Amino acid sequence: MAWARDEGGAAVLEILVQPRASRTRAVGEHDGRLKIQLAAPPVDGAANAALVEFLAVALGVRRADVALLRGEAGRRKTVRVAGITAAAAVAALAP
């Protein structure tokens, strides 16, 4: 998938977030990125923390293995997940 690639022993994911959704879930590909709805509001980093928590649980990795590379203040984010391949991430997150 276009939104996941392997880079240096980790998966790099291109994500589009929708904060303040009714629940947190991955909803599919949108504009070349994985769209994830987050129940958390985009206030004081709550949406970023919710994204990290969601990805860690969904991918079966520690929260410390999920790093936000770009997009801390925007809806388009680039996330690096250590200890997993892009193929495994796609299998776990594809709706």
Curated annotation (Swiss-Prot):
InterPro entries: DUF167, YggU-like_sf
Top-level taxon of the source organism: Bacteria
Signal peptide (from-to): none
GO CC annotations on file: cytoplasm
Family from the record: Belongs to the UPF0235 family.
HAMAP family, alphabetized: UPF0235
Protein name stated in the entry: UPF0235 protein Adeh_1087
